Amino acid sequence: MHFVRHGERGTKMSEDRRDGNIPVLFVSGDTLPEGWEKSVLAVWEKGGSYPTEYDKEGEAPSLDATMTLVIEKPFEEPRLHRAFPGAIEDLEKYRLEVVDGVHDHWIRPEEGKWTYTYHKRLFDYQVQEDLAGGGEGPFAGVAQMDYLVEKLSQVPYSRRAQAITWMPTLDPKTDDPPCLQRVWCRLAEGTDGELYLNMNTHWRSRDAYKAAFMNMYALTDLQRIMAQRIAERIGREVRLGRYVDVTDSYHIYGSYLEEVEERFLRSIRDRSFEQRTWRSDNAIIQDGIQRGRDQIEQEKKEQG
């Protein structure tokens, strides 16, 4: 398998810029690691070259594209890719941050700390205007995911079951606004007569290499949890349908192109798919998951 080296892409990248059209890419995979791997490769090979607001002097521009990624079987094994840049315990802590809100208490914009978590925006959306104004805004929080469960329990085929994160009164003023913008779900009946929960997520911007895998790992787990909640509500099994991930700016930063080449691409060249992925029931993965949970429990004890 041959990959274009980043140093060989100069002519093509400049042509992409002159074209004036940001590349639009579509990839699909049966499993999460397969889809993520294909998406990073697609941006590497076909992404355009664009500057960002975070570039330092002398750094290469980012590779970037608008990406639609389809995961046909979100919970089929293997669930993990060995080349995602992070520790298993960090992946588990991030999952808990998204689905359980274990870091919602870190939202303290008045102290210069976090302005949001995805869990807080999805499960308790509170309108705010002032970064220095403290935690609560003028209106009661909106439990958007509860609405999503209730709506689909009543009308499985509804097109209104969605939750948003963007807060136009606050986010444009911040240095780190949410990347995730919207979650949309709908139930569909398969030819087997079973109900399947389909989920779409929409992102304004995403680091394809360093963030996307962890994002999708957590969001597909949220999909699983929503399916379970709907099933309990309607008294009928709800299985997982496909997961679709749409990103306006799906990018690989120029500052670490060599890391992608040396770590990610090399693993694809040198290892089989089985060798570069893990099943979630692997003992190494389970140990890492437990370490992540233990670290969260320790955080809670230290907070009192």
Residue ranges: model-predicted function:
Residues 2-304:
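Terminal, non-catalytic protein-protein interaction segments that mediate quaternary/complex assembly
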